[in-house]
Amino acid sequence: APSGPSRPQTPTAEDEALRRAPFQPVITCELAGEAETLTEEQQQAILSYTTMLCTALARPDDPLPEEPYTTDTLRQEALTRGFLWSSYIWGEQRVQVYPMNPIYRSEDAVEVWASLRVEANYSSDLTQTTGDTFGYGSLHHLTLNRTAQGWQVVGDDCEESDLCGYLSGCGTASLPSEDILAAIQNYLDLRAAVMAGRTPAAPDRCTAPLREDAQALAETAVDEYAVIYDVQCRPAYFAPMQQSGETVQVTLREILRVDHLRQGVIAATRTSVDHTLTLRQQTDGSWQVCGDSYEALGHTCAVTP
């Protein structure tokens, strides 16, 4: 397996503290405006859901607890949204939620617009949890259903492309099957690990030419970023999968986040890489990435099966 690039500079033992600062985010969410047009249970579901969005913003690399106020799909969407914001460390967040124009589709289903007005402390120095203050607003079209456990947010139509590049569904729409998705994630994780100088966890999930390409990309990343502390990635914006016999073709956008030394501090740069992947099913039923086409950091890949 590739061991990662040689660096002009390598983080020393003293630099181990210079990582993303671990912290417990301070989040305050309040309802305002026409909140009284909703029941207390509906209000609580919206507040809990908004708190989850803020938690994912502050800690996008950590799993969210499974709570009854929303669905697994929206939890994954929240983490994708948070990852897109994660070029910064987000500390205290103060949110006012303005519900508007609730429409009851039935006794057990309601749609409501929710305007979020957020004031957050953030830092571009990843070792700090306080810095500047940033205020922004976003509009969410929420769908709530009544379940046996109470009211649950089951839909969130939101566009924040001008803020962080997020569009509703970008993390969960048109997903391939779980086994194919796992092979894709393992392949992307391998590339990120090599770029960060880590040992890949599952190097056999892609072919030797793609492992060699990961090494070449890592060398290019050193030229771009010099000292790399960490690299994380997320797949998003999947196109519908194309299948032909024992191979499938998947088009997606990889969201790549590189923590690196910039002007004397640890900072993050986020970039997007559009991939066209080819996967082949193995004799044991698992899937292996055997082809990729992309351009990133001035590097071009055109590995065919």
What is each PLM-predicted segment?
Residues 107-175, 245-305:
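Exposed beta-sheet edge and beta->alpha loop/turn motif
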Residues 8-11, 37, 86, 95, ...:
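Intrinsically disordered, low-complexity, compositionally biased regions/tails
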Residues 93-105, 230-243:
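Short amphipathic beta-strand and strand-loop transition segments with alternating hydrophobic
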Residues 53, 77, 81, 86-87, ...:
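Polar/charged side chains located within well-ordered beta-strands of beta-rich proteins
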Residues 17, 63-64, 110, 123, ...:
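Intrinsic disorder/low-complexity detector
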Residues 8-10, 20-21, 44, 147, ...:
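Positively charged, low-complexity intrinsically disordered regions
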Residues 15-93, 169-229:
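Core segments of small alpha/beta cavity-forming domains
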